[in-house]
From Swiss-Prot:
CDD domains registered for this protein in UniProt: Bromo_TFIID
The gene coding this protein: TAF1L
Descriptive protein name: Transcription initiation factor TFIID subunit 1-like
Ranges of compositional bias, category Acidic residues: 1714-1729, 1740-1750, 1768-1783
Composition bias type Basic and acidic residues, residue spans: 1252-1268, 1817-1826
GO biological process assignments: male meiotic nuclear division; positive regulation of DNA-templated transcription; regulation of transcription by RNA polymerase II; RNA polymerase II preinitiation complex assembly
Occurrences of domain Bromo (ranges): 1395-1503, 1517-1626
SMART domains: BROMO
Subunit structure: Can bind directly to TATA-box binding protein (TBP). Interacts (via bromo domains) with acetylated lysine residues on the N-terminus of histone H1.4, H2A, H2B, H3 and H4 (in vitro).
Keywords: Bromodomain, Cell cycle, DNA-binding, Nucleus, Repeat, Transcription, Transcription regulation
């Protein structure tokens, strides 16, 4: 219904209510009883105002109810009935019975069914809430003196109806009121232009209105005002002037016309809703009062009189526009102005001097405008129209209105009413209403009506598809075409635009001049074709418009679901068209891009060079024929029995070592390489080169039992190390012993590499497979067996090869590729035979070929031979095949190209797999390769074993890598069988139903029409559901209804899949999109890839003894197969029962038909009549109605009608009825009924069992985990047991009753196998009881899910694993060194004892971690091992602000966060404080924590000396040597302050002589910051003055070379200023250090004079280098591993005891060093004769003592050096860090008061350099400068 009609109905309903209420009021007043309006709340009210009938209220309640009149309810009736006789509707409108008399054209709405929402209640409530203005003449009347005042105070009533007026005013009021004929006020018809042209003056309703003299003009103005200002009657005079009229707010408003809401509230208009918050429900008497109030207000507006009312408003003057900021909404809604147009309202702005150009001037009609001479700005162009004169407008309007009024009066109707233009009034649609389908059944549907409506739903055509089929439209396969509406597209300009204003009614009297329109094309207009659409091929028209439209409509809900984390946010893919190629780009770059459609990205070079025998397919390595026995032993050959040679004879045989042979062979090859000119040389040229007796040897163990592709002997492969860089700064790939490093961005495997991950892989032309390096056990070795004897050699490394990624497709049996390979292989063999022939012309025999290819027929061989040779029957070449004289034999390269070794390997793999299938019982037809067209159907039908055949797996993998399909990933083709490998089985790209039972989809057949139907879910309930799901309120408000429903459905489905959704009824089946399906596929591939890497790289030794019996395994496998077959046809019990019933019905029908045919022979006449009846029933198409009488439980009979429409059933029924008697039919029916009853009972019994099972499962869920029953104590101790710990009888050492069980020195016992309780817990975690799909009961069958069987196997496998402690294993026997000469390979080469030194921070951390382990071993310390669980102890973290535990302590230690003992002990002490705070100081847990602290103090005290040395090495400021601290501060000044100056980079390093060749000619003493840092590291500066001299030299050099005004000089000046400023900050500290250094130097010199000569050091009279006593040389000894140079020849002598000669020597040793990462202390290397041995460089032999002259002998070893040595049991990889600051020796330490920083990393120790005495003459000049 239209909105206008809706308003008329509401108005009529309101008038009816008002009239009825008036009549009631009259009756009530005549009744004379006290009227209690509140009684309507409890029932009907009588005429006396009392409750009718037997009320539920007693007298006391009625008194209370009457007392509610004090709330003002009574005054409402009194106010309404006070002036009822003055309303103007007299007795003329009332009939004899007191009801309102109906008019002649009244319509009866009593039986109307449509319920319209009552919008008028909101308006009435707002009108009633406004405070009325009372008048003196009404106040003087006394209606109810007692209670009126109280009522008015408590609840002010609405204003009463208008009072009595003067005689002349009564006429106006009557015309205003009764113009519509009734008591309702309807505005008169006045044109809006007339209303807008008049200035209406309104005044409020005042007391003295009776004295005003009315005039016609004022009456008209008042009438206009009340039409356009509906609230003017209750507003003050001043306020009404500020109010806009209705026509200003709503230009489409027409007084007296039906409201067009579509025009009033157009799209985009935001009209304030005044009544939005008002309550909706009001009683009818309240509506009546408010309706009359509106009438009174609208009729009582007097515009001429302007007298002051009781209220006065003082308004401030309106602010000027420049002080008001425009509202954002107004700014947004304002129309966008043309860039050429200029605002006319801006008077203050100076008009632009540029000429304005009209938009339409230079458009499509420019030619015509030019011909007419129209100016550029378009001024003066009016089309020749003329404006109408405004002074005659009222006269013309009044004349027109008079003419229309007369015409309407003559016709009796309103001809121009909007209703007359509607199609519903112009068409006789009532004639097309179908009241009864039987009446028009013979007519059929009208085609013209159906075509107008698109399609009409009927019994036969319920939807468009059925209608199209009926109309003869063939259904197309192109379902992806965009959907178009069957209705025409609305023209928005016609629907929403004001086009009627542009109609030219009179060209000489235009209301306004029209401006030429501007043509604007809307690209979104579907009626416009702006470009020629692309033609799409009919076969491949997969248009994504359907999905894109769906995606765009769900965009908001998808964004919200992504925010809440239900679905993963995917980056939006740009589906736009590819970019058009630039015509000027002539580079043809696209032809040089790497091909994307290739199978593998060739990371690095992939050229594989096989050996020559492999390339030429030599006979033993590439056999031409293999029998069944050889094929079964494919790549597993047994040991041969030799017929001759040393091993052919029995007896003992010696085993020869190969060490000398390997060295000899390597030397020979090196000589050959040198002789050929160096470079790389290919040595694999003969079969002898392929032996394993020389060269390097590794083993590779394949993890697959039968790999899809295997290399033959002599084929090459590469080891590639795939590395994926880390984002940001990447340290580079770690070094590997084997292989070449390849940096890859995309992974070459099914799973992707993680950033920073390196994975080694075997790669060749056949496959790519990940490999995992493992250390060979020392007890393993290799025996090589030849005819001559046995040879033994060591094995170093072994690789485990993961699952292969095939790169070469294996041909299927009897496929075209396989047959072509056989043909080519034979042809190549023939060619090579000809090449080997020494005869001329070349000739070969047929027997040689038949011997090599015994399976080939002679005819096929002859066919190959005829291409190149002729068979000679006579002559010298009789019985030979001679090469044709005109045939050119292919060269070796051509032959190699014809058949490659890879093709042979693929063929061998095919025949080996074919033989395995044959042995398994599969026939030839079961594994034939399918044709390409039927491949999809074929894949669904073949067996699992055939699925795993290599021709299927390789084809599937290669197709998946090309993007043609996906892989099953987990399934039958998994080579591991336990889910740790990929199953290369094809599945389509689009998601399908999974075969296995892991995620069963529930049958959603009962959704439509139930409470689970999302269409019936109200918006309020849907939003409440979203709140339960945790969606924020602001996000919910942004969504529309269907977006909310979409989010509910998606989140319910997600929670139902995860098994935690409470609202699972709204969940839907997981119909994934293709993108979601691909995402799940990638995640599954990544999971299996990571699992495979983890399993195959693990060094854990698994036990193979599982005590399993093969019979049990076979039983389990058979059971699993049966269960899988049962699960393939998934049917519920109801479906099975329906099938049984259907089978029995068919059986009964067959029996009846057989019986009927048997009886037909006896009664031929009946048969004839039956056939005639059936013929008649079949021919006429009538239906058969069978009336069956039933009896219910109470014994009453009722009849059901059953209609049969199928002719066959009708014939059978009629035949039975005519041929059989009643007893026979009842007997069969009773049998059928009995059987059905038994089936019902059986079904009920099974359903009851299921309900009981579910109930028990729910009880177990609520009950929680079962409590462990305490084990019963044995009454007697078992006297056979004797404890191994305490020696007592009756228990074991692992029993808790042993008194020594809790002692700390006893190692904690480890369980060998799982206990029964642990197995039960594992079953609960693995097998979930809440999964109802694991066990199904279908009918009388119990179906187990596949997941259940797998979980049982998992529990069984884990329970059979045995764990043995390492201490209880027998010690390995050490291998004795052989004494024979040939066992030289057993001689272990001499290892240098220069072991690696680790970072002191790592050493300290390892000591602290050992202390933590000791504390963990203390008894009863378990509560402190891990952080406190906040769920168990809820208030712990409210009381304890700094929690700490041993696990957190261990993590901090491993992160190297404790550079000193104090910080470690402080955190440990925090555990004690926390326990005392929470538990109390006397609590047992506090005592335990105190014992942990005591143990820590004891351990720290034991290692105090070692820890002190390590702390000094970590933090140089803690060192005893003041020189170290002084140099540390200076280095920090250089690195952190001076180098941080902006644009100071030219001074960081020496000037490059290549770039600035004349610099060193001008600058004699160059210096730079790097040189200063090197001097600092050499301790060259013992005072600030020497340091500042070098810093000032930088500035002086820059001034000298660049000039004082240069930018470089300014930067140098800034560096010097920063240096002076920083030194001033550390002035006090540096001054003290300088004094200490000077004091130590003087003390050392004095003591050196008194000290006697030491034999290990040069004496004072020994000749020394000239500047040995240079003051710049350091006098101190360092123990800082991260600060100094290599001090391997320094001792641990203190400064006080060191001689000056030693100090000078040590300082001299630093002068030549340039590295900043240094060793800490000297070595303790002594040869057997006791002489100290100089250190060897890294990797050297340690024999430099005789080769170097002037080396200094080493003092005794340093204690700290021994602390930092890595022992054999420690990990060697912990000091792999690197100095991030380049060569900054102090980068790891920051200046602070405590002198330590726990968050910094420490650089590694660089390898030690050989120490040499160096003379400083000319070698130690100042560095370069700027």
């Amino acid at each position: 219904m239209r909105p206008g009609c809706d308003l008329l109905l509401r108005a009529a309903a309101t008038v009816t209510a008002a009239i009825m209420s008036d009549s009631d009021s009259e009756e009530d007043s005549s009744g004379g009883g006290p009227f209690t309006l509140a009684g309507i709340l409890f029932g009907n009210i009588s005429g006396a105002g009392q409750l009718e009938g037997e009320s539920v209220l007693d007298d006391e309640c009625k008194k209370h109810l009457a007392g509610l009149g004090a709330l003002g309810l009574g005054s409402l009736i009194t106010e309404l009935t006070a002036n009822e006789e003055l309303t103007g509707t007299g007795g003329a409108l009332v009939n004899d019975e007191g009801w309102i008399r109906s008019t002649e054209d009244a319509v009866d709405y009593s039986d109307i069914n449509e319920v319209a929402e009552d919008e008028s209640q909101r308006h009435q409530q707002t009108m009633g809430s406004l405070q009325p203005l009372y008048h003196s003449d009404y106040d003087e009347d006394d209606y109810d003196a007692d209670c009126e005042d109280i009522d008015c105070k408590l609840m002010p009533p609405p204003p009463p109806p208008p009072g009595p007026m003067k005689k002349d005013k009564d006429q106006d009021a009557i015309t205003c009121v009764s113009e519509s004929g009734e008591d309702i006020i309807l505005p008169s018809i006045i044109a809006p232009s007339f209303l807008a042209s008049e200035k209406v003056d309104f005044s409020s309703y005042s007391d003295s209105e009776s004295e005003m003299g009315p005039q016609e003009a004022t009456q008209a103005e008042s009438e206009d005002g009340k039409l356009t200002l509906p609230l003017a009657g209750i507003m003050q005079h001043d306020a009404t002037k500020l109010l806009p009229s209705v026509t200003e707010l709503f230009p489409e408003f027409r007084p007296g016309k039906v409201l067009r809401f579509l025009h009033l509230f157009g799209p985009g208009k935001n009209v304030p809703s005044v009544w939005r918050s008002a309550r909706r429900k009001r009683k009818k008497h309240r509506e009546l009062i408010q309706e009359e109030q509106i009438q009174e207000v609208e009729c009582s507006v007097e515009s001429e009189v302007s007298q002051k009312s009781l209220w006065n408003y003082d308004y401030a003057p309106p602010p000027p526009p420049e002080q008001c900021l425009a509202d954002d909404e107004i700014t947004m809604m304002v129309p966008v102005e043309s860039k050429f147009s200029q605002s006319t309202g801006d008077v203050d702005k100076v008009t632009d001097t540029k000429p304005r150009v009209a938009e339409w001037r230079y458009g499509p009609a420019r030619l015509w405008y030019d011909m007419l001479g129209v100016s550029e700005d378009g001024s003066g162009f009016d089309y020749g129209f003329k404006l109408r004169k405004t002074q005659h407008e009222p006269v013309i309007k009044s004349r027109m209105m008079e003419e229309f009024r007369k015409l309407e009066e003559s016709n009796g109707t309103d001809l121009l009413a909007d209703e007359n233009f509607l199609m519903v009034t112009q068409l006789h649609w009532e004639d097309s209403i179908i009241w009864d389908g039987e009446d028009i059944k013979h007519k059929g549907t009208k085609p013209q009506g159906a075509s107008l409506a698109g399609w009409l739903p009927s019994i036969k055509t319920r939807n468009v598809m059925a209608y199209n089929v009926q109309q003869g439209f063939a259904p197309t396969l192109d379902d992806d075409k965009p959907w178009y509406s069957i209705f025409p597209i609305d023209n928005e300009d016609l629907v929403y635009g004001r086009w009627e204003d542009n109609i030219i009614w009179d060209a000489q009297a235009m209301p306004r001049l029209l401006e030429p329109p501007v043509l604007a094309l809307d690209p979104n207009d579907e009626n416009l074709i702006l470009e020629i659409p692309d033609e799409k091929e009919e076969a491949t028209s997969n248009s994504p418009s359907k999905e894109s439209k769906k995606e765009s409509s769900l965009k908001k809900s998808r964004i919200l679901l992504g925010k809440t984390g239900v679905i993963r946010e995917e980056p939006q893919q740009n589906m736009s068209q590819p970019e058009v190629k630039d015509p000027w780009n002539l580079s043809n770059d696209e032809y040089y891009f790497p091909k994307q459609q290739g199978l593998r990205g060739t990371f690095g070079g992939n050229i594989i060079q096989h050996s020559i025998p492999a390339m030429e397919l030599w006979q033993p390595f590439f056999p031409t024929h293999m029998g069944p026995i050889k094929i079964r032993q494919f790549h597993r050959p047994p040991l041969k029995k030799y017929s001759f040679g040393a091993l052919s004879q029995p007896g003992p045989h010696s085993v020869q070592p190969l060490l000398k042979h390997i060295k000899k062979k390597a030397k020979m090859r090196e000589q050959e390489r040198q002789a050929s000119g160096g470079g790389e040389l290919f040595f694999m040229r003969t079969p002898q080169d392929l032996t394993g007796k020389d060269g390097d040897l590794i083993l590779a163990e394949y993890s697959e039992e039968n790999g899809p592709l295997m290399m033959q002997v002599g084929m090459a492969t590469k080891i590639k190390n795939y590395y994926k860089r880390k984002p940001g700064k990447d340290p580079g790939a770690p070094d590997c012993k084997y292989g070449e490093t390849v940096y890859c961005h995309t992974s070459p495997f099914l799973g992707s590499l993680h950033p920073g991950q390196l994975l080694q892989a075997l790669e060749n032309n056949l496959f790519r497979a990940p490999v995992y390096l493992h250390k060979m056990p020392e007890t393993d070795f290799l025996i090589i067996r030849t005819r001559q004897g046995y040879y033994i050699r060591e094995l170093v490394d072994i690789f485990v090869v993961g699952q292969q990624c095939p790169l070469f497709e294996v041909p299927g049996p009897n496929s075209r590729r396989a047959n072509m390979h056989i043909r080519d292989f034979l042809q190549v063999f023939i060619y090579r035979l000809f090449w080997k022939s020494k005869d001329r012309p070349r000739r070969i025999r047929m027997e040689d070929i038949k011997k090599a290819f015994p399976s080939h027929s002679e005819s096929s061989i002859r066919k190959r031979l005829k291409l190149c040779a002729d068979f000679k029957r006579t002559g010298m070449d009789s019985n030979w095949w001679v090469l044709k004289s005109d045939f050119r034999l292919p060269t070796e390269e051509e032959i190699r190209a014809k058949v490659s070794p890879e093709q042979c390997c693929a063929y061998y793999s095919m025949i080996a797999a074919k033989q395995r299938l044959k042995d398994a019982g599969y026939g030839e037809k079961s594994f034939f390769a399918p044709e390409e067209e039927n491949e999809e159907d074929f894949q669904m039908k073949i067996d699992d074993e055939v699925h795993a055949a290599p021709w299927n797996t390789t084809r599937a993998f290669i197709a998946a890598m090309k993007g043609k399909c996906l892989l099953e990933v987990t399934g039958v083709a998994d080579p591991t069988g336990c889910g740790e490998g990929f199953s290369y089985v094809k599945i389509p790209n689009k998601p399908t139903q999974q075969k296995d039972d892991k995620e069963p989809q529930a049958v959603k057949k009962t959704v439509t029409g139930t409470d689970a139907d999302l269409r019936r879910l109200s918006l309020k309930n849907a939003k409440q559901l979203l709140r339960k799901f945790g969606v924020p309120e602001e996000e919910i408000k942004k969504l529309s209804r269907w977006e909310v429903i979409d989010v509910v459905r998606t989140m319910s489905t997600e929670q139902a899949h995860s098994g935690e959704g409470p609202m699972s009824k709204f969940a839907r089946g997981s119909r994934f999109s293709v993108a979601e399906h691909q995402e799940r596929y990638k995640e599954e591939c990544q999971r299996i890839f990571d699992l495979q890497n983890k399993v195959l790289s693990s060094t854990e030794v698994l036990s193979t003894d599982t005590d399993s019996i093969s019979a049990e395994d076979s039983d389990f496998e058979e059971m699993g197969k049966n269960i899988e077959n049962m699960l393939q046809n998934k049917k519920t019990s109801s479906q099975l029962s329906r099938e049984w019933e259907e089978q029995e019905r068919k059986e009964l029908r067959r029996m009846l038909l057989v019986a009927g045919s048997a009886a037909s022979g006896n009664n031929h006449r009946d048969d004839v009549t039956a056939s005639m009846t059936s013929l008649k029933s079949s021919a006429t198409g009538h239906c058969l109605k069978i009336y069956r009488t039933f009896r219910d439980e109470e014994g009453k009979e009722y009849v059901r009608c059953e209609t049969v429409r199928k002719p066959a059933v009708i014939d059978a029924y009629v035949r039975i009825r005519t041929t059989k008697d009643e007893k026979f039919i009842q007997k069969f029916a009773l049998f059928d009924e009995k059987h059905r009853e038994e089936m019902r009972k059986e079904r009920r019994r099974i359903q009851e069992q299921l309900r009981r099972l579910k109930r028990n499962q729910e009880k177990e869920k609520l009950k929680g985990p079962p409590e462990k029953k305490p084990k019963k104590m044995k009454e007697r101790p078992d006297l056979k047991l004797k404890c191994g710990a305490c020696g007592a009888i009756g228990h074991m050492r692992t029993n808790k009753f042993c008194p020594l069980y809790y002692q700390t020195n006893v190692p904690p016992s480890k369980p060998v196998a799982m206990t029964e309780e642990q197995e039960e817990e594992l079953e609960k975690t693995v097998i979930h009881n809440d999964n109802e799909e694991l066990i199904k009961v279908e009918g009388t069958k119990i179906v187990f899910g596949k997941q259940l069987i797998e979980n049982v196997h998992e529990v069984r496998r884990k329970s059979l694993v045995l764990k043995f402690p390492k201490q209880q294993l027998p010690p390995k026997k050490k291998r004795r060194v052989g004494t024979t000469v040939h066992c030289d390979y057993l001689n272990i080469p001499h290892k240098s004892i220069h072991r690696r030194r680790t970072d002191p921070m790592v050493t300290l951390s390892s000591i602290l971690e050992s202390i933590i382990n000791d504390m963990r071993d203390l008894p009863n310390t378990h509560p402190f091992h891990t952080p406190v669980n906040a769920k168990v102890v809820k208030d712990y973290y409210k009381i304890i602000t700094r929690p700490m535990d041993l696990q957190t302590l261990r993590e901090n230690v491993r992160k190297c966060l404790y550079p000193s003992r104090e910080e470690f002990r402080e955190h440990l002490e925090l555990i004690v404080k926390n326990s005392a705070t929470y538990n109390g100081p006397k609590h047992s847990l506090t005592q335990i924590s105190q014992s942990m602290l005591d143990l820590c103090d004891e351990k720290l005290k034991e290692k105090e000396d070692k820890l002190a040395r390590l702390e000094k090495a970590i933090n140089p400021l803690l060192d005893d040597d003041d020189q170290v601290a002084f140099s540390f501060i200076l280095d920090n000044i250089v690195t952190q302050k001076m180098m941080a100056v902006p644009d100071s980079w030219p001074f960081h390093h020496p000037v490059n002589k290549k770039f600035v060749p004349d610099y060193y000619k001008m600058i004699v003493n160059p210096v730079d910051l790097e040189t200063i840092r090197k001097n600092i590291s050499k301790h060259k500066y013992q005072s600030r003055e020497s340091f500042l001299d070098d810093v000032n030299l930088i500035l002086a050099n820059s001034v000298k070379y660049n000039g004082p005004e240069s930018q470089y000089t300014k930067t140098a000046q800034e560096i010097v200023n920063i240096c002076y400023q920083t030194i001033t900050e550390y002035d006090e500290h540096l001054t003290q250090l300088e004094k200490d250094i000077c004091t130590a130097k003087e003390a050392a010199l004095e003591e050196a004079e008194l000290e006697s000569l030491d034999p290990m050091t040069p004496g004072p009279y020994t000749s020394q280098p000239p500047d040995m006593y240079d003051t710049n040389t350091s006098l101190s000894t360092s123990r800082d591993a991260s600060v100094f140079q290599d001090e391997s020849n320094l001792s641990v002598l203190d400064i006080s005891t060191a001689t000056p000669e030693k100090q000078m020597c040590q300082g001299q040793g630093r002068l030549g060093e340039e590295d900043s990462d240094v060793d800490v202390e000297g070595y303790d290397d002594e040869e057997e004769d006791g002489k100290p041995k100089p250190p060897a460089p890294e990797g050297g032999d340690g024999d430099l003592a005789d080769e170097e002259e002037g080396t200094v002998q080493q003092p005794e070893a340093s204690v700290l050096y021994e602390d930092l040595l890595i022992s054999e049991g420690e990990d060697d990889e912990e000091d792999a860090g690197s100095d991030e600051e380049g060569d900054n020796p102090f980068s790891a330490i920051q200046l602070s008061e405590s002198g330590s920083d726990s968050d910094v990393g420490y650089g590694g120790i660089r390898p030690k350099q050989p120490f040499m005495l160096q003379h400083a003459s000319g070698e130690h000049k100042d560095g370069h400068g700027k």
